[in-house]
């Protein structure tokens, strides 16, 4: 009986090893199929960032009441800087993704963290600029700020276009963050039942 049990265990181990060997090429093939799609997704924010930055840089209006430009408002300047940084990151990350390389947990962590940083960066820039636009259109009676878009309508419309494009960039970066987070955390196995402590506390599993 013991010999039969040992033979069965050896057979199971052999099947497991073969399955693991087959899984590696399958995983590499799947990554090769997904790579062009992810490369395009990472390149898409580049055009949006450049468009939003260009529209805002050209935003200026002069009339009998005076002259106003994007550089007069800190929130709009932050929007320009954030779009410039995100455009550079989009270009670099697209090239990085396009080049085939073995996936490692450390690389997945780097991409995940950078995606998070730039997602929050562009989100904060869009939110700050949107708040400025709200005040420009509606004013603030609490501090006796009057609305300005009735006087500088062209300036406000151009700024609104730039902010709208920026929020399109935000959606792209959110999608990229979801992809990189899935790739990272799918590299970790769920803890087996034996990893539960006596008090039902789970012990973190090691990466594959």
Swiss-Prot record:
Highest rank taxon of the organism: Eukaryota
Family from the record: Belongs to the Casparian strip membrane proteins (CASP) family.
InterPro entries given in the database record: CASP/CASPL (IPR006459), CASP_dom (IPR006702)
Residues passing through the membrane, by range: 37-57, 79-99, 109-129, 162-182
Listed Pfam families: CASP_dom
Location relative to the cell: Cell membrane
Record PANTHER family: CASP-LIKE PROTEIN 2A1, CASP-LIKE PROTEIN 4A4
Protein's name according to its UniProt entry: CASP-like protein 2A1
Topological domain spans for side Extracellular: 58-78, 130-161
Main location: membrane
Residue intervals on the Cytoplasmic side: 1-36, 100-108, 183-208
Record note on quaternary structure: Homodimer and heterodimers.
